[in-house]
């Protein structure tokens, strides 16, 4: 009805009179145009009539309307009555079934209304007799039925009898004699036929009986086929065609009794008659038993039985009795299979196959379920025999092995049999088709199996070597496709049914190895996942294989590997896919099975090894398995077990690696890096290249030598017997062009792990995947570098610019891949030059080496320019960049110690061999020879490396002058060097970490122009927080190694004055005043002296401590883990200072307590480090031993300036300075003034005794003391708004414990002190009194300490290096400072209390910010670290500590009074101006605060708040940050104590941070700054006058 609704819509019926009738007529007219009975329009026409009639039956349309429209339609088609009768017939049946009276009545009315359209005769043919009776077409239906039966019986069933009485036996006797005579003479079938005709006529014989007799004789004389076929053909021309078939069918029926057995002769006669088309197969087929539906039932029953057997076999526990029962059942089943019931269809099929009638045989098999016929052994063997005969000529030509004779197969004499094949093309005709019907039952004929495989192997050789035309190629591709199908459907299933035939397996591999792995793996996949489910026999075999595999695996141990291995081998010959699938599932669950399983696989065939590779890949790619554990932080153990098994099995056995490598590559293409674990294991096991972060320093040192030293001393395990396996791995990579793609994919995937994969994954897992990806890249690259020949490597790896720009390879990875290529190139060029000019002089050799380097590296220098923006090359040259990235540790130094160690080991071995009395002499001699050869190799390698290193150093010596261009500041140069060279490479590998440290030292030793060693080390050590936080676990380990090597160098210089003087004394890297561009004068006064260097080293140690404590305090997993790893690595050289070590120890112990239950891995790391730290405690020294704390001599003065942009970080390294503008007389005066100023400050700040007088800024501070008193309240209000609670961070608390006995004036402010006292336990009264006394003593001591030296202004020195466009600004700044008074004398506190951050005036900060913004901010995190702000604040400052003789108390009081009176007058006048200044500053700060995200601001506040406390604890003179020249306006007096100091310090530090981020200022800010500068200059003039008047007074 659904289809009918499409033809006649319901709307037509509803609107029948209006439009429906017309629409229906129109539709019928269209459908009547095609008169054919086969077309779809004819069916639609029928459907339309049916639909119309059905609407009448349902009552939707009146029968008159229907009969009217049907009358109109009858004109359209002549066959309208017949169609309408068919429709009525269908409706008659439907309405009869419905049993609804109303519908039946409607139907009757419709038919009666249409009687004039359809004749009575037609209706009587097609309608039911009861319907005819109801319509009145017949009187009684019963009579009608009886009459029709009588007529049919008379027509079809009445027998025509022969007159048997007239037939005589003599006639039949003569007939048999005629047919049984000797037919070898000239007797022909025509002659015999004439005699038979005579006998029939003479003896009145029945022709049918004669035909039956002829068939009987034919059955008994099969050798005379041709005669009887000819006779029957002639005889049948006189009979009805059906007669012969009926007689034959009657014969078959005779044998269909329960115990009857059809003779084979009868099958043969029927087969021959079918072959010569004397009878039709369809006519005969109906006479044969069993029926097709019985065959189908039998087939289904076999499948059910097979599944029941599977269920029985998979039962978990069976007793021995049940096992016996099961064996008996198996025997019964076998018996059943051996005795099949008599099946006439199969008997005929066998006969057809024997006579070679393939066409009819095929027709019979098509009637049966797939492979049902072939599952009977006789049929299978018959098909096999037919194939043997058919392929014989081709096999003789291409398949017979050399030297083999073989037994030829005779061809069928039957001309109608399939033609024999002469070429591969002929196989398509019938042979492939025969195999398809044979299926898995080729297992019955192993000889034919081998023949087919050999023919296939020959075809594949021809196919692969064929260079013929396109047409021939297309034909051969079709044959290949057929061959693959036969392999899938016949060969592999047949192998499964063969009983462990290893020879067939090896024979099959001979053909399989010619297929590409894609074809092979597809075949294995079909074999494993589909083949076993399609055949009842294979279902059983699969269950039996799994059952047997379980039995073997349960008993497999290390002790019984051999016998179990043999059983595994035997089982694998036939069903490898099922066996390996089960074995791998067990390995994934129990990793202790890996070793015994690997050892037990030695008895497999080549085909089985290949199947194993496929099964491993399939197990790896299993989508149902989770690759992560439930905690989402670690890789699943099943994947780790499979990876380990992969590495072991691929190393031990000759398995094709192509598929596995391609799988890993495909996974990387898909952005999945889990499976890199497989590649890592395979390379490690097959090539012996280990990647581990736990290498000892001895191993690391050995890795810097040659290949022999690496193999002997660079790895944990001795690398043995990897030559063959590494060669196999190399061949697989090169043959399938996977070497470079894998490298590039890994290099790209490193970032993919973070940005694509890492979104939903746990950070810990992302880090592990990144490390795995990176480590595998390093390992794989190392394998390629050591195993590929120079030609192979150079041919595959493109140039550096192509790698980076086209393949988007990260620069570090690109250079890592290119580095061996450069070394190969240079080496080959050098050898060429040596051969061409045979000069033995060393100098000539060096010259040739340098020439070869220039030839190879010149294109590289050009290529690297495109890697970075042009501005980069203003700081460092492309040559320097390429040199850094192209060299390795092998080029820089010879590991003599390592060579010596390995040689000594060999000597010890040789001595042990000599002492061994049990060893046979032959073996002893052999071992000694091996050790001697190895020793000679090592010594030769060492010598070779020494010569190479000498050549490299000579080359570097010549190159160094062009390395660093003096186009920008040294600070920018160092930034680019660290950003583009050191930091990317130091975390690439452990050996690269050592290389980076040694390279920095080498650049220093070479006295490279424009390279500041001091700046470089300072930038590395100053703040490691962000670097450490952004590392993965392994990167942290490498970064730790890098810092360790850097600290080693620094410690060597620090520990001995002579070493320092020798290696650093007169080196440009340790200049502290960096003069005009390109000038590195050797002025001794510009060099950093030994004592000041020790101060700097202490500062670096302090910075490391501060960063470490910060990371430990964060609570972040990554921060804590990474800093603990780094600290563990640098333990040999840090901490050296006792108080820093104690601070670290306390924090680490706290981590141990906190993480014990929460994060066990952090707890383990912390405990490990804590234990090692305690063991190093005895080597730590007090601070005063680490660096000399007394004031150093004046001539050790130093300052570092960076020229233009000098506002960026530069270290305040010296403590003393030369005075450029004042003589001795001015110095004395300024000393007196600053002393008075200090006294005034101390008096004025009597209300706040906890203030730190060391923040005194200049001699004029005394004049501003009163003003500061008045301003104190305003400042406090500002401070409350800015920071309601003082920022104290955990590291401040950690370090604070070291300095409990420091005087109160060291506290940053009252709130800080209050917080610190809360954290401590309450003190007793005695302790408080003692504390007050100590404070008083310190106050008095402090009053005597005043600095007396004047500093060269920052702007003045900047002008020396500044470009002309910046000089106007510099002049303006200098003039302002001169007006303010150049006699600025920075005051230093006592050595015990270094001053916190200096306060910088607002215009000064803005000016600095402009200058900083003119230079790009380095991308590496160290350049934005907060601790570097200390360096920025202190740029271009000069410090000295000096103790003048104390004045008498009465004089002090007088001078203080006068100064205070005058300062009060001045302060009132300027109070209003300052109030405005403060408001503007406050507004500026709030604007800047908005620019910084709140979380960053908060963190910076905490860090800055800490600095106030932590700097007191450092006790290092280098840490004292002194005010700049422009600080007089803000720091007129420090009488307001530490509150003001810490507040201003916080502000200035925040401003510096913002400026270091490189943000641009608005025009509005610039206008404000200009206004402030004007006000400050006017204020400076007044100050100058005030200074003069105070001088006169004195």
UniProtKB/Swiss-Prot annotation:
It is found in: Nucleus; Nucleus speckle; Cytoplasm. Residues 1183-1594 are annotated as: Disordered. Keywords: Coiled coil, Cytoplasm, mRNA processing, mRNA splicing, mRNA transport, Nucleus, Phosphoprotein, RNA-binding, Transport. Belongs to the THOC2 family. Expressed in the hippocampus and the cortical neurons. Residues 535-686 are annotated as: MIF4G domain. This is THO complex subunit 2. The lineage of its organism: Eukaryota, Metazoa, Chordata, Craniata, Vertebrata. Component of the THO subcomplex, which is composed of THOC1, THOC2, THOC3, THOC5, THOC6 and THOC7. The THO subcomplex interacts with DDX39B to form the THO-DDX39B complex which multimerizes into a 28-subunit tetrameric assembly. Component of the transcription/export (TREX) complex at least composed of ALYREF/THOC4, DDX39B, SARNP/CIP29, CHTOP and the THO subcomplex; in the complex interacts with THOC1, THOC3, THOC5, THOC7 and DDX39B. TREX seems to have a dynamic structure involving ATP-dependent remodeling. Interacts with POLDIP3. Interacts with ZC3H11A. Residues 1416-1425 have a biased composition (Polar residues). Residues 1183-1192, 1218-1234, 1265-1285, 1294-1343, 1353-1383, 1449-1504, 1524-1583 have a biased composition (Basic and acidic residues). Residues 896-965, 1464-1491 form a coiled coil. It holds the Pfam family Thoc2. GO terms for cellular component: chromosome, telomeric region; cytoplasm; nuclear speck; nucleus; THO complex part of transcription export complex. It comes from Mus musculus. Disulfide bonds: none annotated. The modification Phosphothreonine is found at residue 1385. Residues 687-1174 are annotated as: Stern domain.
């Amino acid at each position: 009805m659904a289809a009918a609704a499409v033809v006649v819509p319901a709307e037509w019926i509803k609107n029948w009179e209006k439009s429906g009738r017309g629409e229906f007529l129109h539709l019928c007219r269209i459908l009547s145009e095609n008169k054919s009975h086969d077309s779809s329009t004819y069916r639609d026409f029928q459907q339309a009539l049916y639909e119309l009639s059905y609407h009448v039956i349902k009552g939707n349309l009146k029968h008159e309307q229907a009969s009217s429209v049907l009358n109109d339609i009858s004109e359209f088609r002549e066959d309208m009555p017949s169609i309408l009768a068919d429709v009525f017939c269908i409706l008659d049946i439907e309405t009869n079934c419905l049993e609804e009276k109303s519908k039946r009545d409607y139907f009757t009315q419709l038919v009666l209304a249409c009687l004039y359209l359809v004749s009575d005769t037609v209706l009587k043919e097609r309608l039911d007799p009861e319907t005819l009776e109801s319509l009145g077409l017949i009187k009684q239906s019963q009579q009608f039925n009886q009459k029709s039966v009588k007529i049919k019986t008379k027509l079809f069933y009445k027998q025509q009898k022969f007159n048997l009485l007239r037939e005589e036996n003599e006639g039949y006797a003569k007939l048999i004699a005629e047919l049984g005579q000797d037919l070898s003479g000239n007797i022909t079938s025509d002659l015999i036929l004439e005699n038979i005709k005579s006998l029939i006529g003479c003896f009145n014989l029945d022709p049918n009986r004669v035909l039956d007799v002829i068939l009987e004789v034919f059955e008994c004389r099969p050798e005379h086929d041709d005669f009887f076929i000819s006779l029957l053909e002639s005889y049948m021309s006189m009979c009805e065609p059906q007669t012969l078939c009926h007689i034959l069918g009657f014969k078959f029926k005779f044998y269909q009794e329960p115990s009857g057995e059809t003779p084979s002769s009868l099958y043969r006669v029927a087969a021959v008659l079918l072959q010569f088309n004397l009878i039709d197969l369809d006519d005969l087929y109906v006479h044969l038993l069993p029926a097709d539906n019985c065959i189908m039932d039998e087939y289904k029953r076999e499948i059910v039985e097979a599944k029941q057997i599977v269920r029985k076999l998979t039962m978990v526990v069976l007793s021995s009795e049940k096992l016996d029962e099961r064996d008996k059942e198996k025997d019964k089943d076998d018996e059943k299979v051996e005795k099949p019931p008599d099946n006439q269809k199969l008997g005929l099929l066998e006969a057809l196959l024997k006579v070679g009638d393939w066409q009819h045989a095929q027709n019979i098999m098509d009637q049966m379920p797939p492979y049902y016929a072939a599952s009977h052994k006789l049929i299978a063997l018959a098909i096999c025999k037919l194939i043997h005969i058919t392929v014989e000529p081709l096999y003789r030509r291409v398949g017979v092995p050399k030297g083999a004779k073989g037994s030829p197969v005779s061809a069928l004499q039957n001309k109608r049999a399939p033609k024999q094949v002469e070429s591969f093309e002929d196989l398509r005709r019938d042979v492939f088709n025969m195999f398809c019907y044979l299926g898995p039952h080729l297992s019955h004929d192993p000889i034919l199996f081998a023949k087919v495989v050999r023919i296939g192997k020959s075809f594949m050789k021809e196919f692969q070597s064929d260079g013929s035309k396109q047409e021939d190629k297309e034909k051969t591709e079709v044959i290949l496709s057929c061959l693959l199908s036969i392999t899938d459907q016949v060969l592999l299933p047949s192998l499964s049914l063969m009983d462990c035939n290893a020879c067939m397996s090896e024979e099959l591999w001979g053909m399989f190895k010619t297929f590409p792995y894609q074809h092979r793996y597809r075949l294995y996949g079909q074999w494993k996942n589909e083949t076993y489910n399609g055949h009842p026999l294979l279902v059983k075999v699969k269950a039996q294989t799994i059952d047997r595999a379980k039995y073997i695996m349960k008993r497999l141990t290390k002790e019984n590997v051999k016998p179990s291995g043999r059983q595994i081998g035997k089982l694998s010959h036939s069903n490898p896919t099922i066996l390996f699938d089960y074995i791998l599932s067990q390995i994934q669950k129990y990793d202790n099975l890996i070793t015994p399983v690997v050892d037990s696989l030695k008895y497999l065939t080549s085909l089985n090894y290949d199947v194993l590779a496929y099964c491993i890949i399939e197990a790896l790619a299993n989508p149902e398995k989770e690759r992560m554990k439930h905690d989402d932080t670690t890789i699943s153990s099943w994947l780790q077990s499979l990876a380990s098994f992969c590495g072991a099995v691929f190393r031990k056995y000759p398995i094709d690696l192509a598929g596995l490598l391609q799988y890993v590559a495909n996974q990387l293409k898909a952005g999945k890096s889990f499976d890199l674990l497989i590649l890592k294991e395979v390379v490690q096991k097959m090539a012996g290249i280990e990647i581990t972060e736990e290498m000892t320093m001895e191993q690391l040192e050995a890795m810097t030598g040659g290949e022999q030293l690496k193999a002997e001393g660079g790895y944990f395990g001795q690398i043995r017997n990897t030559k063959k396996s590494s060669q196999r791995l190399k061949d697989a990579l090169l043959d399938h062009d996977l070497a470079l793609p894998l490298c590039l994919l890994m290099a790209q995937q490193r970032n993919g792990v973070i940005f694509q994969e890492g979104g939903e994954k746990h950070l810990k897992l992302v880090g592990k995947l990144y490390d795995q990806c990176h480590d595998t890249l390093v390992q794989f690259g190392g394998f390629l570098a050591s195993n590929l020949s120079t030609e192979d490597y150079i041919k595959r790896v493109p140039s550096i610019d192509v790698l980076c720009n086209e393949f988007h390879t990260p620069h570090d990875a690109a250079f890592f891949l290119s580095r061996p290529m450069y070394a190969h190139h240079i080496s080959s060029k050098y050898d060429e030059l040596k051969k061409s000019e045979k000069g033995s002089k060393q100098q000539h050799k060096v010259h040739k080496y340098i020439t070869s380097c220039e030839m190879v590296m010149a294109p590289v220098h050009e290529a690297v320019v495109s890697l970075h923006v042009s501005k980069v090359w203003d700081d460092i040259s492309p040559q320097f960049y390429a040199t850094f990235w192209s060299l390795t540790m092998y080029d820089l130094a010879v590991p003599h110690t390592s060579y010596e160690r390995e040689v000594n080991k060999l000597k010890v071995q040789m001595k042990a061999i000599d002492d061994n009395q049990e060893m046979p002499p032959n073996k002893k001699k052999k071992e000694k020879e091996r050790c001697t050869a190895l020793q000679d190799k090592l010594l030769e390698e060492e010598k070779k490396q020494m010569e190479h290193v000498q050549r490299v150093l000579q080359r570097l010596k010549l190159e160094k002058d062009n390395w660093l261009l003096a186009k920008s500041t040294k600070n920018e140069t160092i930034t680019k060097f660290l950003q583009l060279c050191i930091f990317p490479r130091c975390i690439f590998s452990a050996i690269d970490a050592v290389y980076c440290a040694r390279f920095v030292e080498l650049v220093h030793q070479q006295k490279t122009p424009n390279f500041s060693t001091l700046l470089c080390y300072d930038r590395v050590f100053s703040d490691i927080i962000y670097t450490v936080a952004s590392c993965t676990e392994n990167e942290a380990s490498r970064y730790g190694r890098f810092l360790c090597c850097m600290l080693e160098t620094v410690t060597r210089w620090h520990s001995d004055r002579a070493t320092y003087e020798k290696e650093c004394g007169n080196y440009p890297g340790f200049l502290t005043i960096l003069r005009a561009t390109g000038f590195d004068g050797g002025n001794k006064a510009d060099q950093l002296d030994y004592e000041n260097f020790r101060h700097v080293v202490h500062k670096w140690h302090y910075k490391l401590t501060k960063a470490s404590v910060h990371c430990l305090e964060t609570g972040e997993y990554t921060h804590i883990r990474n800093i603990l790893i780094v600290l563990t690595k640098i333990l040999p050289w840090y901490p050296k200072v006792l108080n820093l070590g104690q601070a670290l120890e306390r924090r680490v112990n706290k981590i141990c307590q906190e993480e014990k239950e929460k994060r066990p891995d952090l707890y383990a790391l912390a405990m490990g480090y804590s234990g090692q730290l305690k063991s190093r405690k005895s080597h730590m020294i007090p601070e005063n031993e680490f660096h000399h704390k007394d004031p150093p001599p004046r001539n050790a003065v130093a300052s570092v300036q960076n020229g233009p942009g000098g506002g960026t970080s530069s270290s305040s390294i010296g403590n003393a300075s030369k005075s450029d503008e004042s003589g001795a007389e001015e110095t004395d005066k300024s000393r007196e003034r600053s002393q008075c100023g200090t006294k005034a400050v101390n008096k004025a700040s009597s209300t706040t005794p906890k203030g730190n007088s060391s923040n005194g800024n200049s001699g004029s501070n005394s004049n501003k003391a009163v003003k500061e008193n008045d301003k104190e309240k305003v400042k406090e209000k500002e401070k409350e708004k800015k920071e309601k609670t003082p920022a104290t961070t955990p590291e401040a608390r950690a370090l604070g414990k070291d300095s409990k006995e420091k005087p109160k004036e060291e506290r940053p402010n009252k709130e800080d002190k209050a917080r610190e006292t809360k954290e401590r336990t309450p003190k007793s009264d005695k302790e408080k009194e003692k504390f007050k006394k100590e404070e008083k003593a310190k106050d008095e001591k402090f009053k005597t300490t005043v600095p007396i030296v004047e500093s060269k202004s920052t702007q003045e020195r900047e002008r020396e290096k500044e470009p002309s466009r910046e000089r106007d600004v510099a002049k303006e700044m200098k003039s302002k400072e001169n007006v303010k008074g150049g006699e600025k004398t920075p005051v230093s506190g006592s050595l015990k209390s270094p001053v916190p951050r200096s306060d910088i005036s607002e215009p000064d900060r803005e000016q600095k910010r402009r200058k900083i913004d003119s230079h790009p901010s380095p991308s590496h995190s160290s350049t934005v670290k907060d601790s570097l702000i200390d360096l920025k604040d202190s740029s271009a400052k000069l410090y000295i500590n000096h103790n003048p003789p104390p004045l008498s108390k009465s004089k002090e009081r007088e001078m203080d009074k006068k100064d205070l009176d005058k300062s009060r007058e001045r302060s009132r006048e300027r109070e209003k101006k300052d109030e405005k200044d403060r408001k503007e500053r406050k507004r500026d700060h709030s604007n800047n605060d908005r620019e910084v995200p709140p979380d960053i601001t908060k963190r910076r506040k905490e860090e800055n708040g800490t600095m106030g406390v932590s700097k007191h604890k450092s006790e290092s003179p280098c840490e004292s940050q002194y005010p700049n020249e422009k600080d007089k306006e803000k720091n007129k007096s420090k009488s307001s104590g530490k509150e003001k100091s810490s507040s201003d310090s916080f502000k200035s530090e925040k401003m510096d941070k913002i400026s270091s981020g490189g943000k641009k200022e608005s025009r509005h800010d610039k206008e404000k700054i200009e206004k402030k500068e004007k006000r400050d200059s006017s204020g400076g003039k007044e100050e100058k006058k005030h200074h003069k008047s105070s001088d006169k007074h004195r």
